Amino acid sequence: MTADKYTVAINENALKILGEIVFLMGASQNFAKYPVSFIINYLLPSIYLNQYRIYRTVKDNKPIGFACWAFINDQVEKELIENDINLSVEERNSGENIYVLYFIAPFGHAKQIVHDLKNNIFPNKIVKGLRLDKDGKKVLRVATYYC
């Protein structure tokens, strides 16, 4: 999916969010080498659909973490696990299976972010995420979280 579909959704706030995500990716050992096309093709749809959260410091409002998710159907889940596909906008809202797609916490706030996801975003839900190999290419397992 190209950025053309999202240009109508790009506004000053979306650009600020993208900048914060780039900052977090640059500070993350796991995401620092990802290409710009990853941001446009994999993360921008989450911003477009408001399926994300940026975490910031209380004192000076600086970004410290990012998570994005999708609500997918069983068929899309199967494809995601088997082929690690890039989800379309339609696929990201296709069902009841909640997947955290990307989680970035380069400054050590992972526990606090998970706590927020479990207690505020997805209380009493089953949430899944893919555990990938170190190159981010191959699915090693599906992690299931009972919130």
Swiss-Prot record:
One of its GO terms (biological process) is toxin metabolic process. InterPro entries: RTX_toxin-activating_protC_bac. One of its GO terms (cellular component) is cytoplasm. One of its GO terms (molecular function) is acyltransferase activity. It holds the Pfam family HlyC. Belongs to the RTX toxin acyltransferase family. This is Uncharacterized protein sll0720. It comes from Synechocystis sp. (strain ATCC 27184 / PCC 6803 / Kazusa).
